[in-house]
Amino acid sequence: MANTPEDTQNTQNDSQNDSQNDSQKDTSARATSARAHQQPQEQPPSPMRVLRGACAQLAELTGMEAESVSSFERTEDGWTLNVEVLELARVPDTMSLLASYEVELDAHGELSGYRRVRRYERGRSDRS
């Protein structure tokens, strides 16, 4: 059976339509794939979660439980806290030794460093 010019034109149109459909499917598949590879943005930890985590991490490293947090602030790199720790229990309690630790955390709340900045008896106030 011989192809007529009309048959040839229909074949070319079908071929072009198939090519366009394949191109659209490919573009759609790439867009779907790109969305699948995007990671959902993590929410930063809440200040309370950071505070509790910092106290727990400091206790794990020093073996001493935090008594209180005297300062807590967000920095460019994460967080900075001052944590009061009971270092030596004495009787009476006013003679117990406390220490103030400066604790640095990254933006995710992971401890990146700490140092003792002050040691004092519980019953003594700061001198001005």
Curated annotation (Swiss-Prot):
Residues 7-22 have a biased composition (Low complexity). Its main location: other. GO terms for cellular component: gas vesicle. GO terms for biological process: gas vesicle organization. Induction: Gas vesicle production is induced by growth conditions that promote production of secondary metabolites tiancimycin A and B. Residues 29-41 have a biased composition (Polar residues). InterPro entries: Gas-vesicle_GvpO. It is found in: Gas vesicle. Residues 1-49 are annotated as: Disordered. Keywords: Gas vesicle. A minor component of the gas vesicle. May play a role in transcription and/or RNA stability and in GV assembly. Gas vesicles are hollow, gas filled proteinaceous nanostructures found in some microorganisms. It is not clear what function gas vesicles perform in soil bacteria. Belongs to the gas vesicle GvpO family. This strain probably produces some gas vesicles from the probable gvpO-gvpA-gvpF-gvpG-gvpJ-gvpL-gvpS-gvpK operon; it can be induced to produce more under certain growth conditions. This is Gas vesicle protein O.
